Amino acid sequence: MSNETTKPVNAGFAKILPVMFAFFVMGFVDLVGTATNYVKAEFGLADGTANLFTTMVFFWFLIFAVPTGMLMNKIGRRKTVLWSILVTLVAMALPIIAYVALSGTARLVLIVISFAFLGIGNTLMQVSLNPLLTVFVKGDKLASTLTLGQFVKSFASLFAPYIAIWGATQLGMWWILFVIYLVVGIVGYVLLAIDKIDEPAPDAGTTTIGRC
């Protein structure tokens, strides 16, 4: 009888590339800070009102974290991440519509709604993305791969202010940031949707808060 220990097989980088793309999309939530600076100046908002935008984005985690875990148990990890990207894409599209078709209070309302969608999408992704990564990477490499994912995520927040400044100075449209990130998000969604992932079957039993 063999005493050899079976080591976990880790997927190559090409297999986890779509997941790394999803980590980048998860970083979109940090552009709220950049967007708030421009929105505050455009609409003459008070500091307290503008600060509520950032707080509101992360408030959604308190509301949706547990329901997202329940959802993930029902539909699986990848589908939950895909839904999170779709919600984030809606968040990217709404400001574009606001600046192309609306003005005044209607524009501000749509931007605020987009921030809410961004917070909800980020919550869905925070709950489901790390578990999805464990399908590909196991053992002692998991911690370093999670760190890599957070590193990739940080680039989204790093690039956001520079893209907004470029858009404002060169095009007169700081919100071109949302257009660029919308395109990147679509690419990330497609890559993850077509990737073949052999993940554990969704929980077939009754999903409760206690089991999340």
Residue ranges and their predicted role:
Residues 38, 69-70, 74:
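Membrane-interface helix termini in secondary transporters
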Residues 34-48:
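Short amphipathic helix-loop junctions that connect adjacent transmembrane helices
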Residues 55-70:
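Central cavity-lining transmembrane alpha-helices of secondary-active solute carriers
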Residues 148-197:
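Helix-loop-helix hairpin linking two adjacent transmembrane segments in secondary transporters
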Residues 86-104:
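C-terminal ends and interior cores of transmembrane alpha-helices
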Residues 8-35, 116:
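Pair of pore-lining "gating" transmembrane helices in MFS-fold secondary transporters
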Residues 114-151:
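Cytoplasmic helix-loop-helix junction between adjacent transmembrane helices
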